[in-house]
Amino acid sequence: ERTLRSWSELALVPLRDTYINVCSAIAGVLYVTVKDQHPRGQGTVDIIITSEAGTATEDLLEKCRVACEEIREPDTDVKVKSAEIVAQDVAVTVTVSSALSQDGLAERVQASVTDLLKLRNRGDSLNELTHADIIHKIKSDVSTVRNVTVTTPAADVTLAEEKVIMAGKITVTVKGV
């Protein structure tokens, strides 16, 4: 992905991908979102940094500010800020054959959902959580599960670009049929 964005570094003025490349090269930066369509008025660019811990530290933000300051146009107002973390509770009911042992099943399902919500495993969809993703992850990781019903969140969750969904309380109910 960085290779594809490298063409932007040849441009005479910094583009969205130029800012992404510069910030992504800084240790500790996991994901960069650039709002370059004048989010605060003409000549403004907002850069949202997601660190490996979710929220970027002030030290990491300062490193990104310095890097962006070196490449920005004189008439561009660049604002570097951290992504906002939103804890999302997840409650699922899994159905398994009553002939199978249910020992440790709830813990395996909980570990599967926790793994789904790890930042490193999610690509660039850090602000989305869909029922389909939850169901697919559980059924892929725990082969004995016949059915998965997601009760929380009640619907797919899509937040603003500057927000990142992380795991809140994970509740698993196991039913035998």
Q: PLM features: what roles do these ranges have?
A:
Residues R108-V177:
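An aromatic-glycine-centered, glycine-rich loop/turn in mixed alpha/beta architecture
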Residues E1-T3:
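Single conserved position on a long alpha-helix in the C-terminal lobe of the eukaryotic protein kinase
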Residues S8-N127:
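Carbohydrate-recognition loop of C-type lectin domains
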